[in-house]
Amino acid sequence: MSILPIVTAPDDRLKQKSQPVLEFTDQTRKFMDDMLKTMYHEDGAGLAAVQVGVLKRILVIDIKDHDSVERPKDFYPLFIVNPEMIEKSEELIKSNEGCISVPGQRIEVARPESIKIRYLDYHGKSQELKANDWLARVIQHEYDHLEGKLMIDYLSNLKRDVVLRKLKKLKNNIV
C-alpha cells in the first residue's frame, strides 16, 4: 500500500463534483486501500478520493476509537462508494471540524444529527447505513467533498477569504 499526496485548499479540484465509480476492479480496491493508509498516515477520521486528486465518489472512514455506538468488530474501516444521502434529520448539531485538505483550521459547522445512506461497500455490494452523532458528521463532511464543498464553504465570505489567504500563504511557504 502507498501513501498518496494530499490535495489542499485552494486547489480547484476540491471544488469539483466527483464522478461515480462504474466498475469494481482489483485496482479500485487497491486505490481504496491506499486511501485508507493515507488517512491513517494523516491521522484523519475520513478521506474522500478527491482529497488525493481522484474525482471519484469514494470515501474511507475509521472512527472506531471515537464512536459512541457499540458496533460489530469488523465494522471499521468503512469503505463507501457512490453514496446516496437518503435521509437527514431536521435536528442540526453544531460542532468543530477539521480537515486534512484545510490544514490548521477548525470550523464550527451545523449538520443534521442523523442520516441514512445507501452505498456500495469494498466488494461492490449494496448497503444501507443509519448513522448519528460523530459517524453521521464524518460521513456528511466527506460526502460534501464529493459534491465539491469544503467545510470553509459554511463560513461567511469574509471569514472564508481570510482562511483561504492563510492557506495560500502556507502553501507558498512550503513550495
Swiss-Prot record:
GO biological-process terms attached to the record: translation
UniProt cofactor note: Binds 1 Fe(2+) ion.
Chain positions recorded as Fe cation binding sites: 99, 141, 145
Entry keyword Iron: yes
Catalytic activity: N-terminal N-formyl-L-methionyl-[peptide] + H2O = N-terminal L-methionyl-[peptide] + formate
PANTHER family, alphabetized: PEPTIDE DEFORMYLASE
Protein name as it appears in the record: Peptide deformylase
Organism expressing this protein natively: Rickettsia akari (strain Hartford)
